[in-house]
UniProtKB/Swiss-Prot annotation:
Interacts with FtsZ. Gene3D superfamilies: YacF-like (1.10.3900.10), YacF-like domains (2.60.440.10). This is Cell division protein ZapD. Pfam families: ZapD. The keyword Cell cycle applies. InterPro entries: ZapD (IPR009777), ZapD_C (IPR027462), ZapD_sf (IPR036268). GO terms for biological process: division septum assembly; FtsZ-dependent cytokinesis. NCBIfam families: PRK05287.1-4. It is found in: Cytoplasm.
Length: 258
């Protein structure tokens, strides 16, 4: 089924930025991990190692735990609401509790076995070179890419298993925040829209939905107090700064918070 709309997302705090980056990389990993071509294995490897770079921070478990705990606290307040399915809510709360327990009980850094793998470390050290890891910088990797497809797929799946708990946690956090509110129909005048934000109940994630056929995209600038959006036309051959659309733009906007 061909998509007719595109959803742009703007994170407004560090946990959301981490989760969106990881979701993006985990999707790339999932798309290519089972494909037999060496080029697909290369793309899967790049996604795996970039994800490892994203999580290479000492405060990751703390930030994820704080986010899960905050979401749990907010969801608990819904238990006595007549509009809430308490059975479904309790299942979600139990899931979040398991994730928090897992993070507390994990004594090592997430992804530590991958950091200790000398083969992956060699590739990772060349990840951001202009050409990335290539034949003359990482000959072992060049040889690995020529191994039978079943060997490469098996290796990638074994390495990706290290991320499985993290994938589940990231998916849960993002699903809860995305479903916390419903999008509103908005009209931007002369390609510009601004809105004051509630600082006492801060927005955590901005979602903006546009029809693909319009061939326009947003520049989103959001802080604690104000949201500003400019709409620009897609022009891949323009050598000058793209000018803001000078017409009314209808779109959907969702300020997600929990």
């Amino acid at each position: 089924m061909v998509a007719t709309t595109i959803t742009y997302e703007q994170p407004l705090n560090e946990p959301m930025r981490i989760c969106l980056r990881l979701e993006h990389l985990f999707r790339q990993l999932h798309e290519h991990i089972r494909e037999p071509a060496p080029a697909a294995s290369h793309l899967a490897m790049l996604a795996l190692l970039k994800a490892l770079n994203v999580i290479d921070r000492p405060d990751l478990k703390t930030k994820l735990t704080q986010t899960l705990t905050q979401q749990t606290s907010t969801l608990l307040q819904l238990k006595h609401s007549p509009e809430v399915d308490n059975h479904k809510l309790q299942g979600l709360l139990d899931t979040l509790d398991r994730y928090v327990t897992h993070l507390h009980q994990t004594t090592r850094k997430i992804g530590e076995p991958l950091r200790e793998n000398a083969f992956l470390t060699q590739i990772r050290s060349h990840l951001y070179n202009p050409a990335g890891p290539c034949n003359f910088t990482t000959p072992a990797y060049a040889l690995w890419l020529q191994q039978p497809s079943e060997n490469r797929i098996n290796d990638l799946q074994n390495w990706a298993k290290e991320f499985e708990p993290l994938i589940n946690i990231v998916n849960a956090i993002l699903q809860i925040i995305r479903e916390s509110t419903s999008p509103q129909n908005i009209v931007a005048r002369q390609g510009f829209y601004q809105q004051m934000l509630n600082a006492t109940s801060p927005c955590q994630l901005i979602q903006l939905i546009l029809p693909i056929e319009k061939n326009i995209y947003p520049e989103i600038c959001a802080g604690k107090h104000r949201l500003v959006i400019r709409f620009l036309p897609l022009d891949v051959n323009n050598n000058e700064n793209t000018k803001q659309i000078a017409e009314e733009i209808s779109f959907k906007l969702n300020c997600c918070r929990i």
